[in-house]
């Protein structure tokens, strides 16, 4: 995996995957899409879709654990704080050899800079929430979210997927 290349790709994902509008029905459709993908692939994950301060969709796929729920919460907090994907923040910290605690004073008990939480952005409004998956390796969590966003927004996933391992 090339960190710089992944960061460039994530920036394109974040710029491209923008909703024209977002409401509870869209959140349900997005969460349901993620659940369908997870069930079809046998992924034991937690799925959380929320605007900041308001949960709109939550589901566990059989085999997901309370740890997955906590990781989803902590990754979502990173999106709420930085308005960027948790994977992008984690990769930037990895490049710098730093942690959220030492660079930003954010406690690990509340924030996790691992892949899987992605900003929900609305045209003309900016980032208004997050969609999070937890249960796979972090790159897999991130890509599952991106794939579902592509499906919901009508983008070809192959053009936005991260490349390499």
From Swiss-Prot:
Domain of life: Bacteria
InterPro entries: PduO/GlcC-like, PduO/GlcC-like_sf, YBR137W-like
HAMAP family the record matches: UPF0303
Family: Belongs to the UPF0303 family.
Protein name (Swiss-Prot/TrEMBL): UPF0303 protein BMA1246
UniProt organism field: Burkholderia mallei (strain ATCC 23344)
């Amino acid at each position: 995996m090339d960190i710089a290349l992944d960061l460039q790709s994530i920036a394109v994902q974040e710029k491209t995957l923008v909703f024209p509008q977002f409401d509870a029905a869209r959140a349900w459709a997005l969460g349901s899409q993620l659940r369908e993908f997870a069930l079809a692939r046998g992924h034991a994950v937690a799925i959380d879709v929320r605007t900041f301060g308001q949960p709109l969709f939550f589901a566990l796929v059989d085999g997901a654990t309370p740890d997955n729920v906590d990781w989803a919460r902590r990754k979502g907090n990173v999106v709420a704080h930085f308005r960027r994907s948790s994977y992008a923040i984690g990769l930037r910290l990895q490049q710098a050899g730093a942690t959220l605690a030492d660079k930003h004073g954010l406690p690990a008990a509340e924030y996790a800079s691992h892949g899987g939480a992605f900003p929900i952005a609305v045209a003309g409004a900016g980032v208004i929430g997050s969609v999070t998956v937890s249960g796979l390796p972090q790159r897999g969590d991130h890509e599952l979210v991106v794939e579902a966003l592509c499906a919901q927004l009508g983008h070809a996933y192959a053009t936005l997927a991260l490349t390499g391992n």
